[in-house]
Amino acid sequence: MEWSLTQNKLLAFHRLMRTDKPIGALLLLWPTLWALWVATPGVPQLWILAVFVAGVWLMRAAGCVVNDYADRKFDGHVKRTANRPLPSGAVTEKEARALFVVLVLISFLLVLTLNTMTILLSIAALALAWVYPFMKRYTHLPQVVLGAAFGWSIPMAFAAVSESVPLSCWLMFLANILWAVAYDTQYAMVDRDDDVKIGIKSTAILFGQYDKLIIGILQIGVLALMAIIGELNGLGWGYYWSILVAGALFVYQQKLIANREREACFKAFMNNNYVGLVLFLGLAMSYWHF
C-alpha cells in the first residue's frame, strides 16, 4: 500500500482523528487527572503525567479512527456524519487501519516505560477501545462500554503510581461510567431520529421519554460517588465546593435538554468539559491547600 501524504490527505487524517474537535480528548483527560491526583496524592511524577496526557490524546485519536471505521457504512446515511473522511472517500479503509495501528503502537511504547501492572491493564484498554464502536449494533447500552473505555485510564493511573487499585479507584471508575452514560446520552439525543432509521442502538433510544430523568439520576450518582471519594481521602472544602459547582452545571444541562432540541442537547454534551475541569480544580485546590 502506498500512502500519498498530500496536504489534503493529512487534513483528512486530522479530521479522522478528531484533533480538530478536542472535546472527546478532554472528557477522557479529566478523569485521568482525577485519578493521578488522588493516587499520588496531588503531586504526580512528571514522566507519569506526561505519559498519561500523551496517551489520552493518542488513544482518543485511535478510538475515533476505529469508531469511524466501524460506522463507515452507516455514516453516509446521517446528515451530521456524511462528510466524514471514510464515507466521503477522503481516507481509504486500508489507510484507516494503518493509522489505527500506528497510534496504538506509539501509545503502547509509552506504556512500556511504566510498571508491569499498568502494561497488563493497557491490554484491556485496547480491547475496550476496539469493541466499543461495534456495540451500538448489538446493544442499547454502548454508552456503558464507552464509559468503561474512557474510564480505564483510572485503574491504569492508580497502578502506575502505586501498583494497586484501591476502593477509591473503583468508585471513581464507576462515577466515570455514570457520567459517560449521561453525557453520551445527551450526545445520542442529537442523532436519535437518524439512528432509529438506520438501526443504530443507543441509551437515548432505550430511555425514550425517560431520558431526561435517567440522565438526572446518573448525574446525582456521579456527585454522590465523587463525594464518597472525597470522604475516603480526607479532601478539603475546596473539593466539596467543586462538587456543588458541578451539580449546578448538571442543573444547567437539564435546562438545555428540556425540549430535546438537537443544538441544545449538543450544547449540554459540550458543557461536560467544564464539569470535568471543575472537579479537577477542586482536587488540586484540596491537595495544594488553596
From Swiss-Prot:
Give GO terms: molecular function aspect only.
4-hydroxybenzoate polyprenyltransferase activity; transferase activity, transferring alkyl or aryl (other than methyl) groups
Q: Name one GO biological process term.
A: ubiquinone biosynthetic process
InterPro entries, from UniProt? HB_polyprenyltransferase-like, Prenyltransferase, UbiA_prenyltransferase, UbiA_prenylTrfase_CS, UbiA_sf
Which PANTHER family would you find in this protein's record?
A: 4-HYDROXYBENZOATE POLYPRENYLTRANSFERASE, MITOCHONDRIAL, PRENYLTRANSFERASES
Q: Which UniProt keywords apply?
A: Cell inner membrane, Cell membrane, Magnesium, Membrane, Transferase, Transmembrane, Transmembrane helix, Ubiquinone biosynthesis
Q: Which pH dependence is annotated? A: Optimum pH is 7.8.
> What organism does the UniProt record list as the source?
Escherichia coli (strain K12)
Can you tell me where the transmembrane regions are? Answer: 23-43, 46-66, 100-119, 141-161, 163-183, 213-233, 234-254, 268-288
Regulation (activators, inhibitors) = The reaction is stimulated by 0.01% CHAPS, but strongly inhibited by sodiumdeoxycholate, Tween 80 and Triton X-100.
What chemistry does it catalyse, as a reaction equation? all-trans-octaprenyl diphosphate + 4-hydroxybenzoate = 4-hydroxy-3-(all-trans-octaprenyl)benzoate + diphosphate
| Protein's name in the database | 4-hydroxybenzoate octaprenyltransferase
The opening ranks of the lineage are:
Bacteria, Pseudomonadati, Pseudomonadota, Gammaproteobacteria, Enterobacterales
Positions on the Periplasmic side per record topology = 1-22, 67-99, 162, 289-290
Q: What else is known?
A: The sdgG mutation, which suppresses a conditional mutation in dnaG (DNA primase), has been localized to one of the ubiA, ubiC or yjbI genes.
Which top-rank group of organisms is this from?
A: Bacteria
Q: Which residues form the signal peptide?
A: none
